[in-house]
Each structure stands twice: as C-alpha cells, then as structure tokens.
C-alpha cells in the first residue's frame, strides 16, 4: 500500500458510495473503523445537492473486537427504522476486510428483511474506486432489471451518471436537450436519481446510452446480453463526436422502429439543437478558423485523466482545434489498452499510464507544453510550473462542481471546451505583456519587494537580495544556487525575465545545458545571447 497522498482514484469505499449516494431509496452501511466516515464530508463539501449523503458507518472498535461483538447488526437495524430505505448495501472497508468477517451473517442477525439487504463484499485491497462503482452498478442492474414491454415512443436509458461525476448535471442536461430535439424520450437515468423501480424498467427502453468507459458499459453489456438491447458507448465530446453520437442513436432507433412499422426518424436541422433554435448549435467550426484560434495550430498540448475524457479531449484538440498533441496518459491501467486503440495515430509516442502524480508533473516540467488538460493534481503542478492548465477529468475540486450550466458533452460542451482552451492558453499572453511593460497599477503580480533590495532568483527558486546602495557590477552579482547548479548574473536574470513566462523555465534549462557544453560556470548576459543564437531563438 502507498500513502494516500494525492491519489487519482479513491478507495473501493469511495466508488460504492458514488453509486448508492446517487440513488433514491438506497442507503449504504460501511463496516469500518471510525475515521472512514470522511467520505460523507467529501459529498457535503463538493456535491451541491440539498440531500444529506446516504451513508452510515458501523464503527469497528478495538473494544468490540476484544469482546467478539459487532455493531453491524444494530447499525443495519437502526438505518432501516430511521431512513426506511428500499435497499441497504453493506460493504467492508480496507480495515475490516483484514478481519475476514462474514458480513452476510452479521447482516442477517439484524432482523431486517433480507430482500432489503445487499452485501457487496468487494476486496478493497484489489479494487479501486471506478472498478468498485462499475461492479456495484452492474450487480444492481442484474438484480433488479426485469423483462418489460418496450415504450411506445422511442426512448433511451442514460447509464453511468453518478454522484461526484465530472460536470454531471450539466452533461446530463446537454444530453436531454439533444434527445428532446430528436423526439426521443429518456426512460431512466441511472444510477443518478434512480430508484429500485427505475432499475426494474430499464429493459423498456429502445437503446442504452453509456458514454463513460469507467462506469455503465458493463451494465449496458449485461442488458444487451440478457434483453437484446443495443447500446451506444461513445462520449459526445466535441462537434465531430456529437454528430456521430446523434447519427448512431438515429440508426439504432430506426432499426427498432422498422420492426414496429414506424416511419424512419431523420436528423433535424442542426440549428434546432442550438440554445436559441436559430443559429448553429456550436461556434467551434467557425471559431477554429479565426485568426485567434489559427494561432493555436502549433501549440503543444498534453492530456491526462480518466479514459473517457482523455480520448474525447485529445481528439477534440487535434481534430477540431488543430493543436499539436505531444502526449497523453491515464491513471487507469485497466483501461489503457482501450485508450491506446482509440488514440492510435494521435500520439507521437507511448501512452503514459501511471497513478503517480509526480511522474506526470515531471513530464510536464520536461516538455513545458503550452496547454495541459488534466485533473486537479495537474492544476496544482502547473501552477508551480507556470504552465496553463484546464481541468478535464476527475479527480476535481469545488471549481468543477458548479451551479451554472457548463457541460462538456454535446454541442454546448464543445463551446465550453473551446472557451476554456482559449482562455487558459491565451491569457498567458496578457500576463507576459504585464510582466514586460508593467502592471500599470493593476497589481497583477505579488507586491514588489521593499525598495532598498534587489532580489534575484536562482534556478532552484532561491532568492539572494542585494542592497541598491551597494549594487556591485554584473560579474559580481551572482544568484545563489544549490550545489552543482549553474549561477546566473543579475543582468542575465533580467534578460531571462523578458522571456514569456510560459517558456521561461524551458529557456533557463536550455541555457544551462548550453553553458555546460561550452564550459561556462556562470551564465552571464553574453552567455545568454550566445545560447539564444545557438538554439535558434
């Protein structure tokens, strides 16, 4: 086990709770030590919903273990009496899994009707958040989905939308709007907002839509195997993907409609999908051809996150905005083969597969791309490196659980993504101009140091202050550095300061390498100029 510090995926406990907290009439009881109830704070902090998390902890104490007793039966009984759920899901934590207790036997001792209890005995040491969520949702579908007559009108199920999902409600709204324009009804959204009765009527829909590779695809596969329901698993990320998504839905609906003797469904006018019903549904196709966006054609981008978002965003950046992809990666090793298959021809090298944020940060520092699309961790790393970053995938923070309408799916989502790419990468120029010409009182940067000192910054961020009253010559003013690193004179640092901030670290690194090649122990203004000429800048 590794220290749980900045992990991309949560524990199995986290995955289970994402599913059950999404549903109506379902409550989770964790058999866990005190402290594992941190999960409830995660939902109250991030999930902007009026309901309290549907989670309870059956606390395991050392005193209980010594006595050979368990609080689980009593906790299950209390949950049943107080919350009156239709289903209680009992799950272990990492700690209680070591005890190898029979959760089923203890749950039966509660006296609660066993038809209302589901023991999900996932191995928390081998299964992480996404796999646990996918497994539980699939198990719920297996247990409750029942043969149903098909709806009279074309309808779909939207599978995989869960609590704490990335831009969950906005994405759901975007899909609902497009389906309404097509004249297709939504039969069930699950697990988000679904109850047990909703799971039972899943087979009534004509088509299943499961846009997330991480959760929903297995359930869609089961429904296809058991009830013969077709499914669409592509995520509508970007204009091109959205058009393919719409055509795929129409094709599947028309197949079933033909069997029923219905007239075929046609693609509506594209303007019908727009917010005002009059203009183009997305501004990306023309905006990508403007002078502003054409300047992005040579900008280098790196994408990292879960499988669904990485594939969709990478294709969007390259195919629709014309950006250069220097690399992509995912923290989900079990989805890596699928990501490689989807991104064949898009990547210059191997797909990065790692769950260590330090490795991702090191790659970003080495390559210094003009834009990083990543998770909350990449946002932190890029802030330190002065690299533009936009969050496109979980894990996220409060900034990505907004009250407003900010989808990533559909035509509306394409506009949101294009806006964020533009503002993330373009505003860097504004910061550089302020650095170069002065802030004109805008106080863009932190306050200047006191007037009597002249700070200089070394390559490793160490500051050496020189009094203006005794400012020595350039040759004497050398920044303090760690052992083995090159020193820079004040004038060289001043020249480096005129380089745009988003490539400044890379220029420093290249200049250091050049100075070592020519045997210069100190980077002076002259060495800096020579390095610039040598490197073609």
From Swiss-Prot:
[4Fe-4S] cluster binds at residue 36. GO terms for biological process: light-independent bacteriochlorophyll biosynthetic process; photosynthesis, dark reaction. Keywords: 4Fe-4S, ATP-binding, Bacteriochlorophyll biosynthesis, Chlorophyll biosynthesis, Iron, Iron-sulfur, Metal-binding, Nucleotide-binding, Oxidoreductase, Photosynthesis. The keyword Oxidoreductase applies. Pathway: Porphyrin-containing compound metabolism; bacteriochlorophyll biosynthesis (light-independent). The active site is at residue 292. Belongs to the ChlB/BchB/BchZ family. This is Light-independent protochlorophyllide reductase subunit B. It comes from Chlorobaculum tepidum (strain ATCC 49652 / DSM 12025 / NBRC 103806 / TLS). The gene is bchB.
């Amino acid at each position: 086990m590794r220290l749980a510090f900045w992990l991309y995926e949560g524990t199995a406990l986290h995955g289970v709770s994402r599913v059950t907290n999404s549903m109506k009439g379902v409550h989770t009881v964790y058999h866990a030590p005190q402290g594992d109830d941190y999960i409830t704070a995660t939902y109250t902090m991030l999930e902007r919903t009026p309901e309290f998390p549907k989670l309870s902890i059956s606390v395991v104490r050392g005193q209980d273990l010594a006595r050979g007793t368990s609080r689980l039966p009593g906790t299950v009984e209390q949950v049943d009496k107080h919350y009156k759920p239709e289903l209680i899901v009992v799950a272990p934590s990492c700690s209680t899994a070591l005890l190898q207790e029979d959760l089923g036997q203890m749950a039966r001792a509660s006296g609660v009707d066993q038809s209302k209890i589901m023991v999900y005995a996932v191995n928390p040491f081998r299964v992480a958040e996404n796999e646990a969520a996918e497994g539980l949702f699939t198990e719920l579908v297996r247990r409750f989905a029942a043969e149903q007559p098909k709806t009279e009108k074309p309808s779909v199920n939207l599978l995989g939308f869960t609590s704490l999902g990335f831009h969950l409600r906005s994405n759901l709204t975007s899909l609902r709007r497009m389906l309404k324009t097509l004249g297709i009804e939504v039969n069930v959204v699950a697990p988000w907002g679904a109850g047990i009765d909703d799971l039972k009527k899943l087979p009534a829909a004509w088509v299943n839509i499961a846009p997330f590779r991480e959760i929903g695809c297995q359930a869609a596969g089961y429904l296809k195997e058991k009830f013969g329901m077709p499914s669409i698993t592509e995520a509508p990320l970007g204009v091109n993907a959205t058009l393919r998504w719409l055509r795929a839905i129409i094709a599947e609906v028309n197949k079933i409609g033909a069997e029923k003797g219905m007239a075929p469904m046609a693609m509506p006018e594209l303007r019908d999908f727009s917010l005002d019903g009059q203009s183009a549904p997305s501004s990306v196709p023309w905006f990508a051809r403007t002078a502003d966006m054409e300047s992005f054609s040579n900008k280098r981008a790196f994408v990292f996150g879960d499988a669904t978002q990485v594939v969709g965003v990478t294709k969007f950046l390259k195919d629709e905005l014309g950006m250069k992809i220097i690399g992509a990666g995912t923290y989900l090793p079990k989805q890596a083969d699928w990501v490689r298959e989807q991104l064949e021809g898009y990547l210059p090298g191997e797909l990065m597969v790692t769950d260590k944020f330090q490795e991702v940060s090191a790659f970003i520092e080495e390559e210094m791309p003009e834009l990083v699309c990543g998770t909350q961790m990449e946002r932190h790393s890029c802030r330190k490196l002065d690299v533009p970053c936009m969050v496109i995938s979980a894990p996220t923070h409060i900034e990505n659980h907004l009250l407003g309408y900010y989808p990533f799916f559909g035509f509306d989502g394409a506009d949101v993504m294009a806006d964020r790419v533009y503002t993330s990468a373009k505003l860097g120029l504004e910061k550089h101009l302020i650095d170069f010409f002065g802030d004109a009182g805008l106080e863009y940067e932190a306050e200047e140091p006191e007037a009597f000192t002249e700070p200089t910054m070394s390559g490793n961020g160490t500051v050496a202050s020189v009094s203006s009253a005794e400012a020595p010559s350039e040759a004497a003013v050398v920044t303090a550095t760690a052992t083995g690193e090159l020193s820079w004179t004040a004038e060289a640092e001043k020249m480096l300061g005129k380089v745009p901030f988003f490539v400044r670290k890379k220029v420093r690194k290249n200049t250091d390498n050049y100075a070592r090649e020519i045997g210069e122990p100190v980077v002076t203004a002259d060495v800096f100029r020579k390095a610039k000429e040598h490197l073609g800048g």
